[in-house]
Amino acid sequence: MVMAMDQNLFNEVMYLLDELSQDTTVPKNVRKVAQDSKTKLSQENESLDLRCATVLSMLDEMANDPNVPSHGRTDLYTIISKLEALAKS
């Protein structure tokens, strides 16, 4: 049961990253980090905790970028929150 919930959360994070990577209203560097984050999370040769921590660091750096519009920052914080929940499970 827990694994199914983890998979659902993982799929939701991947979907949100995909949406962000295609959002033309956010800067190109944010879209690239979202795409790189999807790639990193998909690499199953590392533990999920390590992948989540790496992606959290990447997204946190983008969330602190002053050039990111407020709606983009909100999207980043939503993804960060879900990733933290995924890493803890």
Swiss-Prot record:
Can you say what this protein is called? UPF0147 protein TV0625
Q: Which Gene3D superfamilies match?
A: Ta0600-like
Q: Which InterPro entries match?
A: Ta0600-like_sf (IPR023130), UPF0147 (IPR005354)
* Family (UniProt): Belongs to the UPF0147 family.
Q: Which Pfam families match?
A: UPF0147
Q: Which superkingdom?
A: Archaea
